[in-house]
Amino acid sequence: AIVCDGSGHGLDGKVWGGEIIVNGKREGHLEEQVVPGATSAVLYPKKMLFGILGNFMSAGEISKVAGIAPDECHVLEKQVAENFNCIRTTSTGRIFDAASALLGFCSKRTYDGRPAMLLEANSTKPLDVSLKTKANVLLTTPLFEYLVENIDRDKSCLAATVQQYIAEGMHKIAAQYKKPIVFSGGCAYNRIMVEYMVSKGAYVNEKVPAGDGGLSFGQAAFCAPKQQNPADM
């Protein structure tokens, strides 16, 4: 299964949201990225963007490229250096949020999923970019290096490139296991990702919601047999 979402509690104590699960075991995922400000970065995606760009740019460079005030960049830089109020995540949603902020579509989330939805809404045709993986980890830092290097190109093409990169990369890793692939999670409402997965023969949600509703349904289905035999709980 390819599971792409905004936030989920990982078995390692970190925040998951871009995972490949095979026979109940995590076999692959998106690159871990630092999230300065933890939950506040969900509301202000430029914080997430800073965390990613900080892998290959200085605070001064980030300020110019991302449109973040120099003083705020200094604070975020210190925060990351001291690991103060920072978390680590493999979330697909946070990647989409950061890309949406970089491309100028959304700098503040005023409702659930807004940055990612605007990224999708402003997407046209993806550009060609090489997938970068390492030990079943889809690297997202090179994706943002590409975006920065090509920032003057059509923003709608760059937006589509982000979503296509994640879809192709996650499918490539999952396909190694020679098993039927299921694509689900909150990001399985994303048209670009769904169309790619379906074109590759992956199964997607039809009768059960892909997001929180499907999660609740799955929990109920898992617990129902145990309710009949409380000794198993």
Which residues are covered by each model-predicted region?
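Acidic, glycine-enriched active-site microenvironments
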Residues: 1-233
